[in-house]
Structure formats: structure tokens, C-alpha cells
Amino acid sequence: MTNPVRWLFSTNHKDIGTLYFIFGAIAGVMGTCFSVLIRMELARPGDQILGGNHQLYNVLITAHAFFMIFFMVMPAMIGGSGNWSVPILIGAPDMAFPRLNNISFWLLPPSLLLLLSSALVEVGSGTGWTVYPPLSGITSHSGGAVDSAISSLHLSGVSSILGSINFLTTISNMRGPGMTMHRSPLFVWSVPVTAFPLLLSLPVLAGAITMLLTDRNFNTTFSDPAGGGDPILYQHLFRFFGHPEVYIPILPGSGIISHIVSTFSGKPVFGYLGMVYAMISIGVLGFLVWAHHMFTVGLDVDTRAYFTAATMIIAVPTGIKIFSWIATMWGGSIQYKTPMLFAVGFIFLFTIGGLTGIVPANSGLDIALHDTYYVVAHFHYVLSMGAVFALFAGFHYWVGKIFGRTYPETLGKIHFWITFFGVNLTLFPMHFLGLSGMPRRIPDYPDAYAGWNALSSFGSYISVVGIRRFFVVVTITSSSGNNITRANIPWAVEQNSTTLEWLVQSPPAFHTFGELPAIKETKSYVK
């Protein structure tokens, strides 16, 4: 365990998954620190801790978004959970391309360092995560900060593309004998449905930010109307990537939630095939709705009508998933252990996030709500309470498999309730701020907004206490939890017979399967 060479050159999927988790935890703590600094600045009207440095405020906003999306949620959800679980769940000895797996991870730390360094160059990169021109152009952001951030995005994108190729190949070609796709758990389905959109959308982002790079450094005018360019072109290219990107962390999360709800309800997932097709539909529809982020840029009325309708259609497969989870729990013998609490919390909060998303999907209403705190509240309910709660649920569910020890149940539940209360107190008041017209990315505001902002900032401090409790749980589990034996499987219910991970020892051997398991049982999800 302590040999650095083993970790640096490892081609073992479990080692690399662990590295992804550690990296995601570090980036998550840093991103949380940025968000708390933002909330401290917004706790009261007027200039607070940043002393009137509004560029620094925008640098914090940008860093918070990049850290949380590209360096926390995606590495932990796809790299961590995917690497650890997918080969075991499909009965594969390892990933298809182990050395590619290694470089996929090791591209991320330099990418993170590039992003950090961008904040230290001149005035930093204060563009927001969208990096829209002309704000990101050479006249508004001279110096190397934005170039450094763009290079960071390129590295992160290459990492994701290589990882996606690896997962698609592994799941296509390396399933154990008898493990058909229709026998695979929903988490296994969610990974290729996530990898395809990544593979298709990341090159578009790469093209967009490369155009931006040449505009800044080589005097091209892709985004400058003076030379025949158009800043709206960049918005279309970025959002073509950016919208699938926000579904990408949610899909593996929904696979994890399906796994957990099924186990703790003691029943197979309700409507397995419907769940699969719903995931595929979300993956496809995610590419057809990007301009709903652009209702205010002057699109013609027919275009806005189409994107309004297409955005609302995404609610259908999402609703199928939510009702299937509820139907799975209906009449089940439910055990409210920590993973199940996070799963139920996910379903409740993800539903709220989905409902609040239907409102700005209307292009007419979005004229009023665009770039207000209503939008911030909506996507944080989906991401901060969707993806992150799914990660916490999956961690508590599989931590016994990873460490070979049980986590402290009471501390896990305390972690859930503090976090649940904190994030709701932080984000729910933002709906009211947005409906009142408070714009995003602004470090100061009129006194009328002071009450809800104070409440929101207080909630963010509570969330930090909850996250600290999470690291206490991790420390106790890794150092002094009870050992798990074959006879002491933490979730010993009949439903586990449909997945392979509890049939191997905890923690699994360095090479999980001495010989490939033959899947012979007839209780496949689809007859």
C-alpha cells in the first residue's frame, strides 16, 4: 500500500479507482472552500471578505465550477465508481486497456495544477465556467490566465475521452460468460450511456476552446464581429457540450441509486427495461436541447419553440426513472440504512430540481429568469443534491467492499441529516432570490435581498460541518471498522444474488477473479 511506484504505475482497476476517489475528495474540498468564500462574500450586502475585489469574486466562481464538475463529480462518479465497480459487476478480470486507464487518471493532476496556476497569473480567469467571449477575449482578460484554464480543460477532456473509450470497450467485450447486457445491473448500463455522450461532445468543446485560444493568441476572429466572427457561435459549440455534460454525472448516479433502492427494498428494480431505455433516451435527448441556455441571445421564435418543447420532453424519461424507484420501494421491506437515506434524499431532491427546471424551460419565462439565482438553485438541486448525494450513497454502500470494514452507521446517519439540512437551507432560498430578480455572478446586491442571502450563507456553513462529518466516517472506517467476512456481508438480502460484487471477498483480491465466473442463474432482469 505504501509503495509510491505501485500507485504511480498501477494498471489495476481498483488502485486507479481509489486514486480517482482520493483526487475527487481533494478537489471536492477545494471546490467547497471556494463556495464557502462566495457565500461569505454574499452573506451581507456591500463588500465583505474580498474587500471590493470583484474580479477575485469571479475567479472564485469560475474555480468553484471547474473544480466541482471536472475534478470532483466526474472523476469520482465515472473514474472512481466506474473503475471499482464495473469490472467486478460484469465478471471481468480488469479494464480492457489497463495502461490507458492509468494515463486517464494521471492527466488529471496536471490539469488541476494548470487551473490552479491560472488563478495566480495576473488577475486570474474570471470568466465563469462557460468562458464566453468577449469576456474571455484578449481585451477583457489579457495575460495567460484564460489560456492556462483552456489548457487545463483540454487535458481534462483528453482524460475523459480515453476513459470513455476504455469503459465502452470493457463493457462491450469483457463481460463474463453468461453475463448478457440484460443481466447487467443498471449501474453497468449507465456507464456506456454516459461514455457515449462524453465521446461525442468533448471534441466539440475542444474545437470551441481551441478557436478561443487562436482568437486570443493568433489574431483570428472566430468570436469577433469586427473580423466577421460571431460570439454566439462559441455559445452554440460550448452548450452542445455543456448540456450533455450536466447529464453525464447524473446517469451513473441514477445507476447507483437503482442498485441501492433495489437492495434495501428487498426487490428487483421495477421496470428494468424501462429504466434502461429511459437512460438511453436521456443520453440522446441531452444533445437536442442545448439552446435552452441561450433563449436570451436573439434566437428566432420557431427555434425557441422547438427547444422549449424538446427540453420538456426530457422530463418524461426522468419521470419514468423516479416513478420506477418509487415503485421498487412500494410494498418492499425497506431498511433505512445510510445508503438508503441518501438514495431517498436523492430521489426527493432530484425531483425538486427537475420540477424547478420545467419553469425556465419555457422560453418566455426564461427571459425573466435567465442568469438569476433561480437557475443557480435549479442546477445545484440537480448536481449538488443529485450527483453528490448519489456519490455519498454509493460510498456508504460499497465502502465495506473497498476497505473490507463496516462504516459507523450512526455517524453515517448524522452525516446525512446535517448535509441534507445544510444543502436545503443553502439552496432553497435561492429560488426566491431568483424570482425577485437577483442576478448571478454579482458580488454585491441591494439590501432587499439581504434576508434570503443570510439564510443561504448560514446553510452553507452547516453543509461544511456535514462534509467534515463525512471525512470522520471515512477515517474511522478505514482505520477501525469491523472486518467483513463472507458470512458477514453488510447487505445480506436476497436481492444481492443478482450482482457479483458480494460474491467475492472484501476487499477483493488484487486480481479479483482467479477464473472468470460463469453466470448461470436464470433470474435475469429480462426473461
UniProtKB/Swiss-Prot annotation:
Is Magnesium one of the keywords?
yes
**Lineage: superkingdom:** Eukaryota
Binding, Ca(2+): 41, 46, 443
Q: What is its EC number?
A: 7.1.1.9
Residues involved in Cu cation binding: 243, 292-293
What cellular component terms from Gene Ontology apply here? mitochondrial inner membrane; respiratory chain complex IV
Which reaction equation describes what this protein catalyses?
Answer: 4 Fe(II)-[cytochrome c] + O2 + 8 H(+)(in) = 4 Fe(III)-[cytochrome c] + 2 H2O + 4 H(+)(out)
Q: Where does O2 bind?
A: 247
GO molecular function list? cytochrome-c oxidase activity; heme binding; metal ion binding
User: Where do the annotations place Fe(II)-heme a binding?
Assistant: 64, 380
Question: Membrane topology for this entry?
Answer: Multi-pass membrane protein
Write out the similarity annotation. Belongs to the heme-copper respiratory oxidase family.
- Stated role: Component of the cytochrome c oxidase, the last enzyme in the mitochondrial electron transport chain which drives oxidative phosphorylation. The respiratory chain contains 3 multisubunit complexes succinate dehydrogenase (complex II, CII), ubiquinol-cytochrome c oxidoreductase (cytochrome b-c1 complex, complex III, CIII) and cytochrome c oxidase (complex IV, CIV), that cooperate to transfer electrons derived from NADH and succinate to molecular oxygen, creating an electrochemical gradient over the inner membrane that drives transmembrane transport and the ATP synthase.
Please state what the protein is called: Cytochrome c oxidase subunit 1
Organism (species): Pisum sativum (Garden pea)
